[in-house]
């Protein structure tokens, strides 16, 4: 659930104006903003599943449309931590193990998983998995566990609880094929 500080009288006013405050900072993303705020308000009202993260979202589109910025502003307005993982750093199968810790006998075994440690340190957070399509497909096994049970355990037995986490994944996949607006559209038709 959302932290108690956000539920105070000032926090209630902030929750009512969350969508408008986000729209002041992020332009042309009204549907994403409305869906985010709807899910957060439902969670605050106790209308969401208690064994799942607050919400999980995929923001897809070309670079520069505000996917990452919306995530940052959301965390800022809610007064919670913003944790970002650049998924291009997890393209190899062995690199995925850094998120949950290396298996016994491998370098880094004595360290916990980066993702588990980050969420344990900041249990109320917006977790951004940036450019999710670049990560090795093994990431989806980890995500399935997080989205299904809102928990993840690293190689040392440390358990992170994702019940108070808003998970946002961004993707540029398919954005080159999408319709373009303005001058780019005119240039594209001219070149065809």
Briefly describe each language-model feature range.
Residues 1-192:
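AAA+ P-loop NTPase nucleotide-binding core of proteostasis motors
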């Amino acid at each position: 659930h959302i932290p108690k500080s956000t539920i105070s009288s000032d926090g209630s006013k902030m929750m009512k104006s969350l969508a408008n405050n986000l729209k002041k900072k992020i332009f042309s993303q009204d549907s994403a903003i409305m869906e985010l705020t709807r899910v957060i308000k439902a969670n605050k009202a106790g209308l969401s599943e208690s064994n799942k993260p607050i919400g999980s979202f995929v923001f897809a589109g070309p670079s520069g449309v505000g996917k990452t910025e919306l995530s940052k502003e959301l965390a800022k307005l809610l007064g919670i931590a913003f944790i970002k993982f650049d998924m291009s750093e997890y393209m190899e199968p062995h690199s995925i193990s850094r998120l949950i810790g290396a298996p016994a006998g491998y370098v880094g075994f004595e360290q916990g998983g980066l993702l588990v440690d980050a969420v344990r340190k900041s249990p109320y957070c917006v977790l951004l998995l940036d450019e999710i399509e670049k990560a090795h497909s093994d990431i989806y096994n980890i995500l399935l566990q997080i989205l299904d049970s809102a928990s993840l355990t690293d190689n040392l037995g440390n358990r992170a609880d994702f019940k108070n986490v808003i998970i946002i994944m961004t993707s540029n996949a398919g954005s080159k094929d999408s319709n373009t607006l303005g001058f780019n559209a005119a240039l594209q038709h001219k070149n065809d």
